[in-house]
Amino acid sequence: MNSNKIFIYQALPRLLGNTNDTNKPNGSIEENGSGKLKDISAKFLNTLKRSGYTHIWLIGVLAHASKTDYTKFGIPQEHPEIIKGNAGSPYAIRDYYDIDPDLAVNVNKRMDEFEATVDRIHKSGLKLIIDFVPNHVARNYNSINRPPRVADFGSRDKKTLAFSASNNFYYLPGQDLNVKAFYHGNNAITYKESPAKATGNDAFTAQPSVYDWYETVKLNYGVDYQGGGSKYFDPIPDTWKKMKNILLYWASKGTDGFRCDMAEMVPTEFWQWVIPQVKKKYPGILFIAEIYNPTLYRSFLDNDNFDYLYDKVGLYDVLRDVACGYRPSSDITFALNSVGDIQHKMLNFVENHDEQRIASDFFLKSRDKSEAAMIVTSCINTNPVMVYFGQELGERGMDEEGFSGRDGRTTIFDYWSIDTVRRWNNNGKWNNDELTEKEINLKDFYSKLLNLCNKESSLREGKFYDLMFANYQNTGFDSTRQYAFLRGTDEELSLVVANFSNEEVEITIDIPDHAFSFFNLSKKYNFTAFPLLSSFKNKISFSRQDSIKLKIEANSGEIYNVSGL
């Protein structure tokens, strides 16, 4: 048996373990509470393992800017003008070498609690992924936990220079930062930054807009953006060296992989330099790139640097439009063809912390309509798949938590708890006692689907064969609302069918002769197909010259194990 297909469970610990149901909009940690690393218990992790997951990606683990006062623990006070929400953005890192204190039961022992969590994760048979945020840091970055003899970012910068390859930041000499318009509290002291630094989303202005990443500052990797984009990589820039040390530090703590935030905003040359060095010392460690520019995909995969890339602008965007009825299901084929032979290197998902929940009013408006997209996402290839916590329960993301507002997303900026996840948590029991029948059924569907993808060798490691081209003229198949394909090895074949229609359908599927020879079944004539997802369905018998007749539920699908007789 080959290595398992990767299934990643993405979760924000601050919300995952929080059982406080106060949920006061813009509430403090004292009012609304916070989940802790200890809530990622052996029971919870074993539940994930049984549900088919191989990895857990914890976001918000590293210390990030927050309005909560931890000065009594020696942690510097943050300034509210440069923080989004009370809890702050997990992507505005204030100390690359520290654990976020919100997640600790004993703040003074927060690193010990993280290391114990890593140990629990590994004992459960799962692997840990954390965020590596290389492009920007919190505006008031100040590492109090950096190792001895490690200089802090910016501590040796020549701030009179707008650009220097030896600086860690970009500066706007003679200009003071102005972000006061974004803060509506009563703080009497204005945040001072002089000279102003460039903002994280490449905004070289002393007065960033509310739409900019104003809570962050851009890191300098030796590219002079205001000087025509000239690159100064020899000698190796100081920022490169600091970032390599940070990656090695967290790898030494037992981290099994890094999801690299906004990787395309950092020079490709840096990744080509740093990843081989980390992998040499920690073989098998994963690097996943958040990337939205398809023209850069292959350069990020060259020389086995990044292991996987986000497939947001390809498969995710197409599946969302197909599920909503904006595009025909046949466009899924074009999404796959657009990445060609690197499709197995793409990380598939239908939810994450940046995107709107499937069941939200901004997407499908119902938890009952997500199965078709998830079947395609999970079964289309050997590549990894990610599930966002609460997705498997049909979480709608329609709370108005505070900074985020009601936008169809689960907040990453506020202290909050998620109703569906909180009831599943059930004070650490992680059971179905407080879940509705629909929530249980959806959770069971996810578990069955993920486990099938690793149990069936055809889905785990098999080749892909698109059946859409053979069914465009098939009057018994709607190529605008159904999608069908084969996955197979020399020993096993699976037929996967998804129905994006709001109605149950009876369809026929034509399988061309070429497909049988493609899977070395040219000597077989008669076949049976056993349904794997829906146990109440009967097996189907067919011959090579026949169309296969199937009944597929609305907004769902089926996986059939095909055997030759």
Name each model feature, range by range.
Residues M1-K127, N135-A138, N142-F153, D157-F163, ...:
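N-terminal structural segment of carbohydrate-active enzymes
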Residues L12-L15, W57-S66, D131-Y141, D261-P267, ...:
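Short, solvent-exposed turn/loop segments enriched in Gly/Ser/Thr/Pro and often Arg
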Residues S66, E81-I82, G340, N352, ...:
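Loop/helix patches that line or flank the sugar-binding groove of alpha-linked glycan CAZymes
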Residues N502-L565:
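C-terminal beta-sandwich/jelly-roll accessory domains of carbohydrate-active enzymes
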Residues P13-L15, L62, D100-L103, P134-H136, ...:
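Short, flexible loop/turn elements at secondary-structure junctions
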Residues E113, F270-W271, I507-I509:
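Residues at alpha-helix caps and immediate loop-helix transition turns in enzyme cores, especially N-
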Residues T19-K38, F362-R367, N538-K549:
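Short, polar loop/linker segments at the starts of domains and inter-domain junctions
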Residues S3-N4, A92-I93, P101-V118, S143-G257, ...:
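Alpha-amylase-like alpha-glycosidases and glucanotransferases acting on alpha-linked glucans and related
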